[in-house]
UniProtKB/Swiss-Prot annotation:
Name of this protein: UPF0349 protein BcerKBAB4_4757
One Pfam family hit: DUF1450
Similarity field: Belongs to the UPF0349 family.
Species the sequence originates in: Bacillus mycoides (strain KBAB4) (Bacillus weihenstephanensis)
NCBIfam families the record matches: PRK13669.1
Domain of life: Bacteria
Length: 79
């Protein structure tokens, strides 16, 4: 089974999304990756974000980001 891919920018982790990465890593149904730069510097500067299957998902807080990641996956199933 292919798992949803959640990607984080290391620069954004330093800005606060580290806690979201740690929460999402605990979910065995997700592949969570960390990269040096994802090329979304403007979005990265604004606040917590991640790429979910290649699409930008943002949150005003870490909790909101985690919730938005799950909401996005519910609204956009892979199959």
């Amino acid at each position: 089974m292919i798992k949803p891919l959640i990607e984080f920018c290391v620069g954004n982790l330093a800005s606060g999304s580290q806690a979201a990465l740690e929460k999402l890593e605990k979910d065995p149904n997700l592949d969570v990756m960390e990269y040096g730069c994802l090329g979304y510097c403007g979005i990265c500067f604004e606040g917590p974000f991640a790429l979910v299957n290649g699409e930008v998902v943002q949150g005003a807080t870490v909790e909101e980001l985690v919730n938005n990641v799950y909401d996005y996956m519910d609204e956009n199933p892979m199959f």
